[in-house]
């Protein structure tokens, strides 16, 4: 129903209806650029979630219902209604990205252990879906840390999607299964773009927490030649994933000699990219002895005020991190 807004402080509109609406889909798809305050009841949000044809309104309903479910004053009956509504959206024929958003929303309000309906829903999603939605279902099932699903995770390691493989590796590590170590180390050899398989292997080993995998992790750190993304993040760059895994196992000191030698070579080569990438890796170790790196940096760049500013910033962040 079109309306016109007059240039005045307050506009009032009246609509004649046969009964009060279950929800009002105000500002359909947010085509009107504005800020609004529009209070709705739990019933209205639930109805909006199930009946609206506006994907933005449905997403807003998910967000608001998550907040309601997380409110300690919300009754168990109301929370169960919200959970059921989310499950209906997840198993619908809707667009996969929206259904994934609904699944992530459900994960925010569910506590372990999951009931049979939720577990079956996740298992069915893993069988029938792919990529993002399948990975999200594996992530959620992985939170159970249940060894029963080891074979499901192992099968998912052969998926075409790196996202699914990564989720499966992490879930497998969480089970602490005696089979996980061998499976995860073998994953490193699976061909992948820029060694994504290695990153997934390391992520899984981090969750497994088995210190007998340290030798493998050290070999990954020593490998400075394999294809990789130079993005300085454990999500995309395997040396950073390896350092994170080693730190999680409480063995960070084993990587320091490797990285310090590499850092010294980068200083000799005057390769700024290598210098600061090595600094980032060394900083992740959170070791007191890493302070010597900053002494060498300040000596190397004592005549370059711009680089000294960058060094100062790195050092400040490092010193804060080792205080924790």
Task: Give the location of each predicted region.
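Non-catalytic accessory/interaction domains
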Residues: 1-120, 124-134, 165, 321
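Structural detector for internal amphipathic alpha-helices that build alpha-solenoid repeat scaffolds
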Residues: 30-34, 59-73, 97-113, 132-146, ...
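Short secondary-structure transition/capping segments
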Residues: 50, 230, 305-307
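Short inter-helical turns and helix N-cap capping residues of alpha-solenoid HEAT/ARM repeat scaffolds
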Residues: 53-54, 94-95, 129-130, 160-161, ...
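Short solvent-exposed coil/turn linkers within tandem alpha-helical repeat scaffolds
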Residues: 92-93, 191, 249-251, 269, ...
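Terminal, low-structured helical/coil segments at or just beyond the last alpha-helical repeat
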Residues: 293-324
């Amino acid at each position: 129903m079109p309306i016109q807004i007059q240039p005045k402080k307050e506009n009032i509109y009246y609509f004649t209806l046969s009964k009060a609406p279950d929800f009002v889909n105000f500002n359909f798809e947010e085509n009107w650029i504005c800020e609004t305050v529009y209070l709705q009841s739990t019933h209205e949000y639930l109805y909006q979630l199930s009946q609206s044809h506006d994907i933005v309104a449905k997403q807003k309903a998910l967000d608001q219902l998550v907040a309601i479910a997380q409110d300690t004053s919300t009754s168990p009956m109301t929370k169960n209604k919200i959970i059921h509504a989310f499950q209906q959206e997840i198993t619908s024929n809707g667009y996969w990205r929206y259904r994934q958003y609904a699944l992530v929303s459900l994960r925010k309000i569910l506590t372990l252990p999951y009931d049979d309906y939720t577990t079956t829903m996740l298992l069915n999603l893993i069988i029938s879906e792919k990529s993002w939605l399948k990975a999200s279902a594996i992530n959620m099932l992985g939170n159970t840390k249940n060894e029963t699903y080891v074979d499901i995770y192992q099968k998912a390691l052969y998926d075409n999607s790196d996202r699914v493989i990564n989720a499966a590796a992490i879930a497998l590590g969480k089970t602490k299964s005696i089979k996980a170590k061998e499976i995860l180390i073998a994953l490193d050899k699976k061909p992948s773009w820029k060694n994504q398989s290695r990153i997934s292997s390391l992520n899984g080993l981090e969750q497994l927490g088995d210190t007998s995998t340290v030798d493998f992790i050290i070999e990954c750190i020593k490998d400075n030649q394999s294809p990789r993304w130079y993005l300085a993040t454990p999500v995309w760059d395997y040396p950073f994933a390896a350092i994170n895994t080693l730190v999680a196992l409480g063995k960070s000191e084993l990587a320091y000699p490797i990285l310090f030698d590499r850092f010294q070579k980068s200083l000799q080569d005057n390769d700024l990219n290598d210098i600061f990438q090595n600094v980032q890796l060394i900083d992740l170790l959170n070791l007191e002895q890493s302070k010597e790196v900053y002494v060498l940096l300040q000596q190397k760049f004592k005549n370059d005020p711009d680089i000294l500013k960058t060094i100062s910033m790195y050092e400040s962040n490092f010193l804060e991190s080792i205080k924790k």
